[in-house]
From Swiss-Prot:
Pfam families: Tsg (PF04668), Tsg_N (PF23782). The gene is twsg1-b. InterPro entries: Tsg (IPR006761). Belongs to the twisted gastrulation protein family. Its main location: secreted. Binds directly to bmp2, bmp4 and bmp7 and can form a ternary complex with bmps and chordin, thus preventing the binding of bmps to their cell surface receptors. Knockdown of tsg and bmp7 results in the siren phenotype with loss of posteroventral cell fates associated with decreased BMP activity. The lineage of its organism: Eukaryota, Metazoa, Chordata, Craniata, Vertebrata. This is Twisted gastrulation protein homolog 1-B. GO terms for biological process: regulation of BMP signaling pathway. Involved in dorsal-ventral patterning, permitting peak BMP signaling by antagonizing the residual anti-BMP activity of the cleavage products of chrd. Functions to promote the formation of ventral mesoderm by increasing the activity of bmp7 and other BMPS. Seems to antagonize BMP signaling by forming ternary complexes with chrd and BMPs, thereby preventing BMPs from binding to their receptors. In addition to the anti-BMP function, also has pro-BMP activity, partly mediated by cleavage and degradation of chrd, which releases BMPs from ternary complexes. One of its GO terms (cellular component) is extracellular space. It comes from Xenopus laevis. The N-terminal domain is sufficient to interact with bmp4.
């Protein structure tokens, strides 16, 4: 009697091999869900490095906006060295179209027993980062002008505080957006290690650039 063998789909084998690679080869926190979907659908099976790019377009369409960050996870582009720029130092931000300031304030007042961490800091801390960025961009766009300065009034902002909420656990960027919308936030910041930050109505910029999700710090 011939021994029976367990037939494992090629997509599953590829997924396993990708996930055991060193971290500098693939941003697992950012890409896991979408890469799994594309591999299961067998849309990223070809190998451009071997001269076969028959599936490249389909794979790119499947990964969508995550193509730039995740193409190395499916062997479509050269691996990146994420040790130089850890996921916690990168983030995606977006304004939410229909914020509900009163709801956000009500949910973040006082101590809560929910699975999130409320952080409040002066708005001027946001403005200092924002001014540095604007000044740098104006200098790049107008190199012929020297001593470019950005004038921002701090008189009113000094009394204002920016309140943000960090969810304890890691989540996808879609879940981050939905969760922040459901609590009335004005904006959200999703760190590329999957930490989610909801930004309150008093914040001028996009909240804090520091990861503070208690169960999602790496």
């Amino acid at each position: 009697m011939k021994p029976s063998f367990l037939h494992i789909p090629a997509a599953a084998l590829l997924l396993c091999s990708l996930w055991i690679l060193p971290i500098h080869c693939c941003n697992k926190a950012l890409c896991a869900s979408d890469v799994s979907k594309c591999l299961i659908q067998e849309l990223c099976q070809c190998r451009p490095t071997d001269g076969n790019c028959s599936c490249c377009k389909e794979c790119m369409l499947c990964l969508g906006t995550l193509w730039d960050e995740c193409c190395d996870c499916v062997g479509m582009c050269n691996p990146r060295n994420y040790s130089d720029t850890p996921p916690t130092s990168k983030s995606t931000v977006e304004e939410l179209h229909e914020p509900i300031p009163s709801l956000f304030r009500a949910l973040t007042e006082g101590d809560t027993q929910l699975n999130w961490n409320i952080v409040t800091f002066p708005v001027v801390e946001e403005l200092s980062h924002h001014e540095n960025l604007v000044s740098f961009l104006e200098t790049v766009n107008q190199p012929q002008q020297q001593n470019v300065s950005v004038q921002v009034s701090h008189s009113n902002e000094k009394e204002h505080m920016c309140t943000v909420v960090y969810f304890d656990d890691c989540m996808s960027i879609h879940q981050c957006k939905v969760s922040c919308e459901s609590m009335g936030a004005s904006k959200y910041r999703w760190f590329h290690n999957a930490c989610c930050e909801c930004v309150g109505p008093e914040c001028i910029d996009y909240g804090s650039k520091t990861v503070k999700c208690v169960n999602c710090m790496v």
